[in-house]
Each structure stands twice: as C-alpha cells, then as structure tokens.
Design a protein with these regions (language model features):
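Sec-dependent signal peptide recognition
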Residues: 2-10
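C-terminal motif of bacterial Sec signal peptides marking the signal peptidase cleavage site
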Residues: 15-18
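Beta-lactamase-like hydrolase cores
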Residues: 21-66
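Glycine-rich, acidic and aromatic/proline-enriched surface loops and short helix-turn segments
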Residues: 40-55, 90, 136, 144-149, ...
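Flexible glycine/proline-enriched surface loops and loop-helix/loop-strand junctions
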Residues: 61-67, 111-112, 120-127, 155-162
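Active-site SXXK
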Residues: 69-93, 118
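Short, well-structured active-site flanking segments
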Residues: 86-101, 187-192
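Mid-domain, small-residue-enriched loop/turn segments at the edges of structured enzyme/sensor domains
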Residues: 107, 114-115, 129-183
Length: 192
C-alpha cells in the first residue's frame, strides 16, 4: 500500500510558474495557463489540478472543471487497492492475480500479473475481480469511511461502477481523498 501511495504522490510533483492567484479559506488557488498547452498537445479537454501540501496551494488551468464530478475511471484503483489490502484480499504488491485464459481488451492483460503490475498497467479485469471479492457491503462501508462520496453501485454494478454509470468524483475530491489517505498512513507509521 505504501508503494501505491508513494507512486501517486510522486506523480503529482511538478515545477510551477505562477500566473493568477486567488485565496479561498486559507487555501490558495493559482491559475497556470501553461497546463492548457499540455492538454492541447494531447488534444484533450479538461483540467490539471495539483496540490502543494507545503504551500496549501492548488494549481490548475480550470478550477471550475476541477470541481466538477466525473467518473473516477482508472483513479478508482487507489481506493479499490487500499480496501483489498485492508481486507486481506491482496497481501502485498507481489500477490499474483491469475488470468482466467479469456481474451481481454488489451494483450498486456492476458497473463498472470502481480498486484504491482496490475496497478501499473491499469488491468481493468484484475480490478473488476478485486471489486467482486470486496463485495457491495464492504465496498460501501469503506468508501463511506474514506468519505469517497457519490459512488453509485449495487451487486450488479460492483465491478464497473467507476467506469460507467452515474458515479462522480471531482479532481478536488480526489486530492482530498489522497490527502486523508496520506495523513492516515503517516498516523499508522507513527503508531507502529
């Protein structure tokens, strides 16, 4: 779990060029128009949102977009992984997730994968199986505990609600979740 959170937080580190800054409830929001260039280079509409914990500052090209809920998609691997580890479904990053031999959307998913590799290559069928093992009741219980809100699912959609349907989470809510997860991990490390 520590490896997963470390990868997530490392991927959020950037060098910033400040442009337009506003303050809201001691949180600073700084607009970075250069982020639009990054998105434009990939021909993608959206926003980039980065949080600097030391400066209590958010950086984005579009704060309205960043506060609007979207399907969590691949980012749901993070809470899904934490829940699986907490419940003992996954022991560690070397736990093997067996391929059932069925054809998958991507060839790279068509083999047994370590948990670490399944995370790295975003193996959707692996995470669908993990979600089924977690089950509806435990998934709801943990998401409520994490304050990971607006996930809409039942026993029929337990393995795809983060990919399709009406579940929504904003980039801002995602960062709030990661901040809480980091804090809780630090608290656990300090108590060990």
């Amino acid at each position: 779990m520590k490896n997963i959170l470390f990868v997530v937080f490392i991927s959020m580190i950037f060098l910033f060029v400040c442009c337009n800054t506003t303050t809201n409830k001691n949180i600073i929001e700084t607009e970075i128009s250069d982020f639009d260039k990054i998105l434009d280079s990939f021909q993608v509409n959206g926003s980039i949102l980065i949080y600097d914990n030391d400066k209590n500052t958010f950086y984005s090209n579009d704060f309205d977009w960043a506060k609007n809920g979207k399907l969590p998609a691949s980012t749901f691997k993070i809470p899904n992984s934490i829940i699986a580890v907490e419940l003992g479904i996954i022991e560690n990053d070397t736990t093997i997730l067996k391929w059932n031999g069925e054809q998958r959307k991507m060839d790279i998913w068509e083999k047994d994968l370590s948990f670490k590799d399944a995370f790295r290559i975003s193996c959707v069928p692996c995470y669908q199986e993990i979600a089924r093992k977690i089950g509806t009741i435990k998934m709801k219980e943990y998401l409520e505990k994490f304050e990971y809100k607006n996930m809409i699912f039942d026993s029929l959609t337990i393995d795809n609600f983060w990919l399709e349907g009406n579940s929504k989470i904003s980039q801002k809510q995602q960062i709030d979740f990661l901040r809480k997860a980091e804090f809780n991990l630090q608290m656990q490390q300090n108590s060990d």
